[in-house]
């Protein structure tokens, strides 16, 4: 279950921009790791930043309102026949400090944390200005939405992230962009984790967090994946279900399979086509199976003559 951005910011769906900004300011100041000693404050601070990053942008907010988190992060379909049939999915850069400093600009909302001589006070939260024992930030996990075609053939995804990089003085830092490249291998399953070690924010007293992308499968218009198998539902009229038929299935690699069905198709019947599923991650030259299920379509009405013919054929 993903984030409800409106719930995170404690606003309603019809809230105006000013209300969203006011909510972010209040919650960000309350939950900033320099202000809150609660164990969950860093994660809440990140969620607040991601929610504001989406809801403060009219385009992102519009997609989120209409298609939900899956549409926002997985991409939404464009017009039929487009060369790029899906929009690029949204990926939060994972840097709540960037959102915070862009929001407050040059103002220092934490002036109360500096002593009379202007020196920063050690709050021992391991944040950007903290001093003490060096520790690693918790991993930053982000969903990577991929189509079945991406996972069938394999592909390369390039994702831009923004992170803090230490300057030469090893104390101050600058936000810089970096491109992370993910080589998707054929057959990767949902839940596959890709780790980029220590690619998170740099700081004087922290080990940068690992960035972990977790594979999520986009919904497919024809197939549903179960492990390494593909499930396909074929609508079939009752007459063909009783008298045999040939099923045509267009595969992910654009081949057309003609599968003869010589059995009587009943509601629990299914056909297995070996080797027409997804590639096996450990051996992509081998594939799972294709399971064909049937949606038997009954007629909405029958003439008296047809009813009589069915009685003679089926009940005698």
Swiss-Prot record:
Output the InterPro entries linked to this UniProt entry: DnaJ_C (IPR002939), DnaJ_domain (IPR001623), DnaJ_domain_CS (IPR018253), DnaJ_subfamily_B (IPR051339), HSP40/DnaJ_pept-bd (IPR008971), J_dom_sf (IPR036869)
Q: Where in the cell is it found?
A: Cell projection, Cilium, Flagellum; Cell projection, Cilium
- Keywords, ordered alphabetically: Cell projection, Chaperone, Cilium, Cilium biogenesis/degradation, Flagellum
Q: Identify a single GO molecular function assigned to this protein.
A: unfolded protein binding
Q: Which GO terms describe its biological process?
A: axonemal central apparatus assembly; epithelial cilium movement involved in extracellular fluid movement; flagellated sperm motility; mating; protein folding
Keyword Chaperone in annotation: yes
- Protein task: Functions as part of axonemal radial spoke complexes that play an important part in the motility of sperm and cilia.
What is known about its subunit structure?
Homodimer. Component of the axonemal radial spoke complex 1 (RS1), at least composed of spoke head proteins RSPH1, RSPH3, RSPH9 and the cilia-specific component RSPH4A or sperm-specific component RSPH6A, spoke stalk proteins RSPH14, DNAJB13, DYDC1, ROPN1L and NME5, and the anchor protein IQUB. Interacts with SUN5. Interacts with IQUB.
Q: What is this protein called?
A: DnaJ homolog subfamily B member 13
